[in-house]
Regions:
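Alpha-helix N-cap/helix-start capping motif
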Residues: 18, 68, 81, 102, ...
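Cofactor-cradling patches in redox/metallo enzymes
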Residues: 144-232, 267-363
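Iron-sulfur-cluster electron-transfer modules
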Residues: 41-222, 226
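Ferredoxin-type iron-sulfur electron-transfer modules and their immediate structural context
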Residues: 1-61
Length: 363
């Protein structure tokens, strides 16, 4: 396996370092040393030195969520997410992907999403149909909401409808490339998906990214990969806050204490921590978990549940425990993947709400 000098420098700097050992959400959930960034770097270094085969470490390579908690706490600037993505890309080029990943990649290429699904649920189709007319604003729902959590996509649309917003939702939404980028990195096929998506999105002045996963890719990764995006991309929390502050969106504040689960894509990657909090504070009494904002702890997602569902439940259960530890009874999420993961691990003591649920007055 050939990796760049920069990648190898990061690998060799991380393989014997314990600085981020305590913060990896998957390492903490499994209790396995192999799940930590340090162990992943050690495995990669052994492959580059010929002591292990690439096949030997690939399951471990796909135990990383890419959440960047390790990068956040590293005072010396090393990046385990970067070298993990580099190895995935190289494994794809060498035909060394695990079968369960190969299947998801094939789904992405054939259907535009890792789940291999082609049509959203009927209720969502009806909601999309109400906004098929062309406008200068596009609501980009993303694969998780369209195919795995359509009821949440309907609620996202309902929030904008409550504000009287004029927007379009596509019956056939192009893949943003976020899932391909996570699975295999900056391959030609990934960039082709992104270019095709950009060609559609550039037909609008404003694109509202409902899913932080897509928001991060559209606003950061496209530029890194040389994909031209001329439209304004705004996250759903930021757009909803604009509607609230302009008086177009109305909410009712309840005496309900809640904590907010920051999606790492918003807090760490895009620096958006105040917009969701302003929205939540208008609807409920907001307090904080110990680790929040840029220091947030990832709570799981839908994509990784395709190959490690038990670990995802453990990751989510630990985050719920974090909320319980500060006496919280309600967690509000702004990411559909984390919402689904937390819901799957929901306990009687802690209620899980999406940001849309809160705005619409749901419990």
């Amino acid at each position: 396996m050939k990796l760049s000098e920069k990648v190898n420098q990061h690998v060799d700097s991380c393989r014997f370092c314990w600085m981020c050992h305590h913060i990896c959400p998957i390492g903490n959930a499994t209790g396995h040393e192999r799940s930590t960034p340090r162990a992943r770097a050690l495995g990669i270094s052994l492959v580059t030195r010929g002591a292990l085969r690439l096949d030997d470490i690939m399951d471990n390579i796909y135990e990383c969520a890419g959440c960047g908690a390790c990068v956040q706490v590293c005072v010396t600037g090393w990046d385990p997410v970067m070298f993990t993505k580099a190895v995935r890309e190289q494994a794809a080029l060498e035909g060394k992907l695990p079968e369960y990943i190969r299947k998801l990649v094939a789904n992405c290429l054939s259907s535009g999403n890792a789940y291999g699904m082609t049509e959203p649920a009927g209720e969502l189709q009806a909601a999309i149909g109400r906004h098929s007319a062309g406008t200068d604003t596009l609501l980009f729902l993303g694969a998780d909401a369209r195919y795995k959590m359509p009821e949440q996509a309907v609620k996202t649309i309902a929030v904008l409808e409550r504000a009287g917003a004029d927007f379009t939702v596509l019956a056939e939404e192009p893949a943003s490339g976020a899932q391909m980028d996570y699975l295999v990195g900056a391959l030609r096929e990934t960039k082709a998906q992104m270019q095709a998506c950009a060609a559609v999105l550039n037909g609008y002045k404003t694109v509202i990214a409902a899913d932080p996963t897509d928001a991060k890719v559209l606003r950061r990764t496209y530029a890194e990969y040389g994909v031209d995006l001329s439209c304004r991309v705004v996250t759903f929390p930021a757009y909803a806050l604009e509607l609230l502050q302009s008086g177009r969106l109305t909410v009712r504040k309840r005496e309900m204490p809640v904590v907010y689960q920051d999606p790492f894509q918003l807090s760490r990657d895009l620096g958006e921590t105040e917009e969701p909090r302003a929205l939540i504070s208008a609807c409920a009494d907001l307090s904080e978990m110990l680790l929040h904002g840029e220091e947030t702890v990832w709570a799981g997602n839908l994509l990784m549940a395709e190959w490690m569902p038990e670990v995802m439940r453990a990751v989510s259960a630990r985050r719920i425990f974090n909320a319980e530890s500060v006496g919280a009874k309600t967690i509000v999420t702004a990411c559909v993947g984390e919402y689904a993961a937390l819901k799957a691990a929901e306990t009687d003591g802690v209620n899980i709400l999406s940001l849309e649920d809160l705005i619409l007055g749901g419990n």
